C-alpha cells in the first residue's frame, strides 16, 4: 500500500485532506498531525524545518511516496530545504534508506506544499491587482506568499495581516461562537483599512475555512475570499497527471488512515469539527 501522505502541525490540514479526497476519492491517504507540538506558527525557521522533516520521514517510513504539506507554516519555512537538501540525499542513499526500513526505499519521493498552488490562481481572481492575505504570524513573516505572487504576477500588490488567535479559536471549537466575531472583524477591518482597493483575500491558514461564514459577513460582497483546499486538490490532480511515474505507484482503495502525536481521543474529538465525521486514530511518535 502506497498512500498519499498529508501532514499538518495541527488539524487545519484536515480541510486540505477533505478537499483532496472529494476530488480524488480513489486514492489511499495517510494523515499525520503533529498535534503534540502544535502550533508551529510562532516557531523559528530552524525548529519548523526540523519538526517537518521528522514528520515527512515518518510518512516515508510508513509507505508514502508523495507527501503534501497541508500546513502553510511548514510550506513557508521547511518545504524548500526539504526539496533541495533532504530529498536528494534520500535518492543518493537509497541503500541506506532500505536499512532504515523506509518502505519502497528505491522509489523516487516528492514533497509538495500548498502556497504555490494558491499563488498560481490569484492573478485570475483580482481585477484591481490588490490582494489581501490573512494568515498566521509565521506565514506572514516568511513572506512566502509575497515572493511566490511576485514571481508569477509582479503587478499584484499584496497586503498581509497576521491573525494569531484565529487558529486557536477554531481548535477550541469556537469558530461559530459569538465571541469569535470580535477577533475576525478586527483583522478584516485592519486589512481593508491598510488597502481599500483589495478585491481578493487569501485565507493563508488551513484552519480558516471553518471561520468562512464569519469572514464573509465582514468582507464586502465584491471581495472574493479564496480558500486553499480546492486549489490544492486541483493542483495535485494535475501533478499526478504530469507524473505517471508517481501516480502509478499510488494505491487506490479509497482508504484513509489517521495518526497523531497527541492523545488519539482528543484528536478524534477535534477531527469531528473539521470533517463532520468520526475517524479512527492511532498514536505515533516522531
Feature-to-residue mapping (PLM):
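Non-catalytic structural scaffold of enzyme domains
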Residues: 1-286
